[in-house]
């Protein structure tokens, strides 16, 4: 790639003509085939969420979160009431459409509308949603909202560098690993080195195509097993996009 040079022969970034600050995310419902994302509401969601989290056999899913497992529904409800009032992070409940109940939460956080940057975080999925199409669709719906509706340029994922499941999830969802910020956070009385991942807007069309193909009913057998892994579909979509770009430039 040929660098752009300014009047002093210094390399500079690509121009962004007409760029304007993006809107902050709103408290809107996001509908999918398997799930629906609703702005967190303690009165509507706390009971279902506490029950969903109570299906965990131990507290390992909370190791890398700021909180510990809640020991009562009332304790979780108080947390949910405070979280529901927050604008950043903006928390969403994941509603299982088939069961019509909340089974997890995730949020859009660290909003930077001026630069078009936003982060998905505070992902707390119960065993009822883990490793199901619902969990993938929930991530897709929020990513599509950030890129397609709000017009953001960069979508981030950050986690404790020791949190292997989170890192694998980011990679499966198409995020690119960017590095580790050492000694970035102190939480629960211990150090956290933070692993950084991102998706940028130029990558999103291929990822969107892959998500849609993976979530399509025909990608699942009668027993619920996937026919094509998401990674395979992402590789195919990315290759097609690169080929189209090369052809247009030839």
What are these regions (language model features)?
Residues 1-132, 145, 149, 190-195, ...:
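GNAT-family acyltransferases
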Residues 135:
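Glycine-rich acyl-CoA binding loop
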Residues 142:
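Flexible ATP-lid and adjacent glycine-rich G1/G2 motifs of the Bergerat
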Residues 148-158:
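Conserved GNAT acetyl-CoA-binding A-motif
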Residues 157-167:
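Conserved beta-strand-loop-alpha-helix junction that forms the acyl-donor binding cleft
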Residues 169-170, 197:
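Conserved active-site tyrosine of GNAT-family acetyltransferases
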Residues 176-190:
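Conserved catalytic-core motifs of GNAT/GCN5-like acyltransferases
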């Amino acid at each position: 790639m040929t660098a752009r040079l300014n009047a002093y022969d210094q390399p500079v970034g690509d121009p962004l003509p007409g760029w304007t600050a993006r809107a902050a995310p709103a408290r809107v419902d996001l509908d999918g085939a398997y799930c629906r994302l609703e702005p967190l509401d303690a009165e509507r969601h706390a009971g279902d969420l506490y029950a969903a989290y109570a299906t965990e056999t131990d507290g390992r899913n909370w190791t890398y979160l700021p909180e510990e497992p809640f020991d009562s529904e009332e304790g979780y409800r108080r947390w949910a009431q405070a979280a529901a009032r927050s604008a950043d992070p903006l928390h969403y409940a994941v509603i299982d459409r088939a069961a019509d109940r909340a089974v997890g939460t995730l949020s859009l956080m660290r909003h930077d509308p001026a630069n078009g940057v936003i982060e998905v975080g505070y992902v707390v999925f119960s065993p009822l949603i883990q490793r199901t199409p619902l969990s993938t669709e929930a991530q897709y719906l929020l990513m599509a909202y950030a890129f397609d509706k709000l017009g953001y340029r960069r979508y981030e994922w950050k986690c404790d560098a020791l949190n292997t499941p989170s890192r694998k999830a980011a990679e499966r969802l198409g995020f690119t690993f960017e590095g580790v910020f050492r000694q970035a956070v102190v939480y629960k009385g211990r150090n956290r080195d933070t692993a950084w991942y991102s998706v940028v807007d130029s990558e999103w069309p291929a990822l969107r195509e892959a998500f849609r193909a993976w979530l399509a009913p025909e990608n699942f057998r009668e027993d619920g097993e996937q026919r094509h892994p998401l990674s395979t579909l992402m590789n195919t979509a990315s290759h097609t996009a690169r080929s189209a770009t090369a052809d247009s430039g030839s």
